[in-house]
Amino acid sequence: MDGNVRKNWLMLIILVVIIAVSAVLADQIESDFGKVEVSVVEIVDLDGYTIAAKLFVPDGASASNPMPAVVNMHGYQNDKNVQDPFSIELARRGFVVLAPDSLGHGDSGGGLNTAAWFGDPTYVMGNETALAWLIKQPYVDAANIGVMGHSMGGMNAVKLPGLFPDNVKAVVQQASSPGSPELPNLLMLQARYDEFGGFRENQPRTEELTSSETRLAALGLEAEGSIEWDTTYGSFADGTARRMAFINMDHHLLPLKNKSVAEAVDWMRLALKDGEGGSMWIDPTKQIFMFKEILGFITLLGTMVTMLPITNLLLKTKFFAPVAQPMPNRHFPDKGTWWKLATLNALIGGILYPLTTQYGGIGGKIEQWFSWAKLEMGNGVAAFFVANAVVAGTLFIFWYRNAKKEGVTMYDVGVSFDEEKTKIDWGILGKTVLLGVILFLWMYLLEGIFQWTTGQEFRFAWPYMRQFSSGQRVGFFFIYLIPALLFFLINGGIFLYGQARMKEYETPAKTQWMWWLKVVYAMVAGLFLIWAFQYLPWFLGGAGPGFETITFFQMDLSQFTSMWPLMLFVYIPEFIILFWFLTWFFRRTGKIYLGALMISGLAIWFLAAGSIYLM
């Protein structure tokens, strides 16, 4: 066996072992090493839609020993697994926990009805069906139920006590609205850097909430009074306990904060267990959920890395060998020109991000223009991809007209298979597509094996690699793949590795890493500037967020203020990682096609498999 073949097989085997061990360990942590039974249940609502929910049942819970229970609801664009920090830590302390996927999220069906969400006070996205099911379970103490939710989930949580007044005894709001003053035993986890103005009563500084009339009313205090952070008011015995906890975190990442989880867990103990922890009680600050999150990231990254040895092994075969073409090495812009091109591209991306993404998201115009565009957040991403591709493609056309006079051909930008003429070798291109399909199916099946056997998705703090829960989501994948392919072929292809082609360094390894760093600058620096404008003044003690009162050429950017800057916490690290693989694929094949296919496929898999969709 060839030495390189042996090394690639060894690398693949080691990676699969690491992934398997990480998934099994994550499963063990989730179940507190066998002390909690974890399963996914499916509940059908009155409209016939399926509500998928993750159920945590501690050892000892039975009809003769029913335990208090908590319904744990996720936020917009999230799913049941995002709430794992609360679910895991509650269950290992003696609470039955049910974490549903709201309608249109995760594995649930139905789609989100935005009109009902904002107009019907009884619409809770299927979570009432989940709670009704939970109450009927024999191992649940139906008279001691808690509800909690993050963001949108919190908006649902405050409605449930009115629908189940005899059951719900406690409410925990995680970066959400306070609800009515009549709510039983209310804990508000207030994110210091909450991007959503409504969740901080539109105050420029969260610290000023201590004198908010709305919050004073929610806590049952006099209108002229002042709230003390992390102080409990009222009594658990009569349901008037109130507390507003200050969490030094932004909206999205609040569930990952130790203090958030500790506050919520202890609140449920005080409200649902009369302050007694019982034999399963553990200090609320002693938490294990983060180990599961880290292991999930290892499975996610490890699965992507398996593309390298598999690609190398397939390119060693006679059939796929032609896919590995020599890299073009005739055209290189000088150092100064490269930095100008990269900076211009970065700035264009930074400018287009707020201008285009707001056409998606809640109330975005794209869903109004195209009835088939059901992924609300996906619409904003697609608009960003298309706009960048159009601008970069237009600039490339003008550049190429002049570059041709200097002998540059489409071969030099990784497009043509002939050095002089623009020629596509459809046989090689077909094999390239087949190779990409094999790589994608490998990752999809690998994730599926462990999702089916251990219940573990490959993710960190956000839905990434997971199985498509319906044919509808598969359809979304192919619809939104088109704008992504356009972006990665033009911006992530002919621009990066053609128009802005970089020179080789002393070794292939150094070239890979240096190219990657420069690609990150060219493709991500503009997004980082947007992130910095939104957050840095806020983080450094000023008022925020940065875009809240900004207009751009008479355009109101209020739609952009909250959700889309928040998503940069997801997109910036995601892009940084994906661009490493994009660079590797170009260097390995000498063409832009395989990299564009794989990276757009991954990006849209992450988006379509778990993203919110509309009815």
Set out the residue ranges of the language-model regions.
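Cytosolic-side membrane-insertion boundary helix
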Residues: G277-M307, T317-W339
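Hydrophobic membrane-insertion alpha-helices, especially the h-region
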Residues: L10-V24, T306
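Soluble extramembrane regions of membrane proteins in the secretory/endomembrane system
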Residues: E30-F289
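N-terminal membrane topogenic signal
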Residues: G3-L12, T337
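Hydrophobic alpha-helical transmembrane segments in integral membrane proteins
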Residues: A23-K35, I612-M615
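Alpha-helical transmembrane segments of integral membrane proteins
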Residues: T343-M615
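Membrane-interface helix-boundary signature
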Residues: N4-N8, I288-I298, M377-G378, W426
